[in-house]
Amino acid sequence: MDNATQKKYLSFKEILIYSVGLFGLQMVIFYLNSYQVEFYSTAGRLTTAELVAVPFLILAAKIVSAIFDPIVGNLIERKPDKGFGKLKPFVLYAAAPLVLFTVLLFVDVPISGAALLAYIFVITTLWSMAMTMADVPSQAMSAVLTPNPTERTNLIGFSGTFRSIGQAAPYVVVPVICLIVPGGAGISGTLSVSEYLWNALGIGI
């Protein structure tokens, strides 16, 4: 039997680091999914009719950014390996823009109406592109980190658990951050505009 399929290539620390990375991405995604529209409602800069349009703008932004998916895949394939692998650099490049756009989506910008809707669409599109830049190579890593099929299965299972936890994490992290922020809503109560921003900073970073 091929020794490559029996040898251990990953330490528990490496598996944990990879899993925590996926956890973080899912936490950011689900924070936006759960609180983005609610934030705009709390900010009070959009009419009811305009608020109804926001989910459709978010969907349109994600559709536009979906065009970016195969482009990222092609860039990964064409990138020469300079010792860091083909996938890791893309995740690193995406980190800062992803944090930036996550924060910008929860900034109470002093505009309203069509201008604010345009802002939401543009920043959500850029956020989705940054997320694609991070998520596509992150998902692909599980297939290339080890040629050992048993180890790969364990990696996928372990990281999958962290992904699932990350999806639920905002519902725990948000109240905790609100407890820390002076005058925050805490465990219960309505979040203020500034608390959405503090949570975006905390979860994004």
Report residues per predicted region.
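Membrane-embedded alpha-helical bundles of multi-pass transporters/translocases
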Residues: 2-205
